[in-house]
């Protein structure tokens, strides 16, 4: 009897050692990280990482294990794990993992890994040569007895693979791990999934993934990756600011007396807030008061220079299922509708908002944004008030020259840029920028040379360190040399002389037969008729310009 007790005493410690040595999901998926002992709420569809791991079918290798070098033919497989975090508690956070194969390798439509055609000169000679032909393995039943033995189509915890259509073409096993739980799935060269954050505590967490590929007798580890994600009870928001004449949108410096547009973007990739009532409360910090908007875009004009701090509070009233009416030991606290202190427990506002919803069928969530901006005097407007062509002598340059007289309102510019493009203002033909010094009045004369006569679209931009403004015009440029102008004048005078002679002859023939010798009154009448005819003649050959503004956009001004 004593001998039996001795055998039993030896067996019990041995069994305890075996149990202690059994590998668990936490040992494999934590990758050496020691997670704090915390009781996490169960995530729907996930399992505890204290479950046993089948190390025989899914071997575990340390980071420095030499077997990693031979886990994949032709090189090393890397993986990229990304997330759309941060996530508002209660919404879904999505993760996407993508495998990146060695050069010249890709996945085909059947889930096999093949060499790309004509990838490099030293690539394998045979076209579409397989790196891993898993379809052939399955068809030949080379991996166990595929008609009766399904022991290999299981996850590390022993659960069978889901047999949905096309499952045999998914030759990678993805194992995700976070907050003491794991999720397992099969897939191809990429996989994505979403997790509801209702039962995940607020704060930063790590999502880790381990990927195995199908092998002949076991699954082979090929890559690991991890990323950080955030669960918060504050609505994630981003505010973009823009202004018409602002030169640099990223420096938070804007112009006085010019509207600033504020556009609010709520980060809600899972559309958790789609059915919520959202409002935006603005305080621009300039003493103008509070503004409540129902839309995500608003504008505000600062009439004073200086530094200002703007504050935005976004409120979302989220409908939730009504909870059963149960007596509560305490009344709701007003802290739900006030700003949470930075020293408070981050999980407290979440619990209060969920346990004490207004009316029992919705909860409040808030998002906050604060930014400092600087308002300065800027260039508000630029006008082209005059364009003059410059006549050149034959010894000077033949390129036509035009002087532009421009004025501006606001601050004085420090640089001027002149851009020339085709008549449609679409194809640029060049731009010239020069520094300028304006001390008294914003009136500048800008001389611009053109390659040849023609019609051009001209843009003149005046700018300083913080702002810029633009004026445009469509102009028609004539030849610039004086010889060309002189030739044009002579031709015009010659034509004028010819037409004058013809006109004199016509007048002589017409009025000769009506000219009485002795009637002075009739003479005066004929003189009036002659004057009217000469006026008509002058109007025909010398029409007055009806264009008062040479910068009209409808037609080019001739300079």
Swiss-Prot record:
What are the start and end residues of every segment in region (Disordered)? Answer: 329-356
Source taxon at top rank: Eukaryota
- Residues on the membrane's Cytoplasmic side span 509-559
Query: Mind telling me which GO cellular component terms the entry cites?
Result: plasma membrane
**Signal peptide boundaries:** 1-22
Spell out the SUPFAM superfamilies in the cross-references: PKD domain (SSF49299)
Pfam families from the entry? PKAT_KLD (PF20433), PKD_4 (PF18911)
User: Extracellular face: residue ranges?
Assistant: 23-487
Q: Which residues are glycosylated?
A: 92, 133, 145, 149, 192, 199, 248, 274, 307, 311, 459
Family, similarity comment: Belongs to the PMEL/NMB family.
Official protein name in the record: Protein QNR-71
Which organism does this sequence originate in? Coturnix japonica
User: Its encoding gene is what?
Assistant: QNR-71
């Amino acid at each position: 009897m004593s001998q039996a007790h001795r055998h039993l005493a030896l067996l019990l410690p041995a069994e305890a050692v075996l149990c202690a040595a059994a590998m668990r999901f936490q040992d494999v998926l934590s990758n050496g990280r020691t997670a704090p002992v915390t009781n996490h709420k169960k995530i729907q569809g996930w399992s505890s990482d204290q479950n046993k791991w089948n190390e025989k079918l899914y071997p575990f290798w340390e980071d420095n294990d030499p077997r990693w070098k031979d886990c994949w033919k032709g090189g090393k497989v890397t993986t990229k794990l990304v997330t759309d975090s941060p996530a508002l508690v209660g919404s879904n956070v999505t993760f996407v993992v993508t495998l990146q194969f060695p050069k010249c390798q890709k996945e085909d439509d059947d889930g096999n890994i093949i060499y790309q055609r004509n990838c490099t000169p030293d690539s394998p000679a045979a076209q579409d040569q397989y790196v891993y032909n898993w379809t052939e393995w399955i068809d030949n039943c080379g991996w166990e007895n595929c008609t009766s033995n399904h022991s290999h189509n299981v996850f590390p915890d022993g659960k069978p693979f889901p047999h949905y259509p096309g499952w045999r073409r998914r030759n990678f096993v993805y194992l995700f791990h976070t907050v003491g739980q794991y999720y397992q799935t099969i897939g191809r060269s990429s996989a994505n999934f979403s997790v509801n954050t209702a039962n995940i505590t607020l704060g930063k967490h790590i999502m880790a993934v381990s990927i195995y590929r199908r092998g002949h007798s076991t699954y082979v580890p090929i890559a690991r990756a991890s990323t950080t994600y955030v669960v918060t009870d504050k609505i994630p928001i981003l505010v973009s600011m823009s202004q018409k004449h602002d030169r640099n949108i990223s420096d938070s410096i804007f112009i006085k007396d010019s509207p600033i547009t504020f556009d609010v973007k709520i980060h809600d990739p899972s559309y958790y807030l789609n059915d919520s009532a959202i409002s935006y409360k603005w305080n621009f910090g300039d003493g103008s008061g509070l503004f409540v908007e129902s839309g995500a875009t608003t504008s505000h004009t600062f009439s004073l220079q200086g530094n200002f701090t703007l504050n935005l509070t976004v409120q979302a009233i989220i409908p939730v299922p009504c909870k059963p009416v149960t007596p509560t030991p305490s009344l709701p606290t007003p802290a739900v509708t006030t700003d949470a202190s930075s020293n408070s427990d981050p999980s407290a506002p979440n619990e209060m908002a969920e346990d004490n919803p207004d009316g029992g069928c919705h909860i409040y969530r808030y998002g906050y944004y604060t930014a400092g901006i600087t308002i300065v005097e800027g260039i508000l407007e630029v006008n082209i008030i005059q364009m003059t062509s410059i006549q050149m002598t034959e010894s000077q340059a033949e390129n036509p020259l035009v002087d532009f007289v421009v004025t501006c309102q606001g601050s004085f510019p420090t640089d001027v840029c002149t851009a020339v493009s085709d008549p449609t203002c679409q194809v640029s033909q060049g731009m010239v920028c020069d520094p300028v010094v304006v001390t008294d009045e914003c009136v500048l004369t800008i001389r611009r040379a053109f390659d040849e006569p023609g019609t051009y679209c001209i843009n003149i931009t005046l700018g300083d360190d913080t702002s810029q403004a633009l004026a445009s015009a469509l102009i028609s440029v004539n030849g610039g040399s004086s010889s060309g102008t002189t030739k044009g004048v002579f031709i015009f005078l010659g034509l004028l002389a010819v037409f004058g002679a013809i006109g004199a002859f016509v007048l002589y023939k017409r009025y000769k037969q009506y000219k009485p010798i002795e009637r002075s009154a009739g003479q005066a009448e004929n003189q009036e008729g002659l004057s009217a005819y000469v006026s008509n003649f002058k109007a025909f050959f010398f029409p007055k310009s009806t264009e008062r503004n040479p910068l009209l956009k409808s037609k080019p001004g001739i300079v």
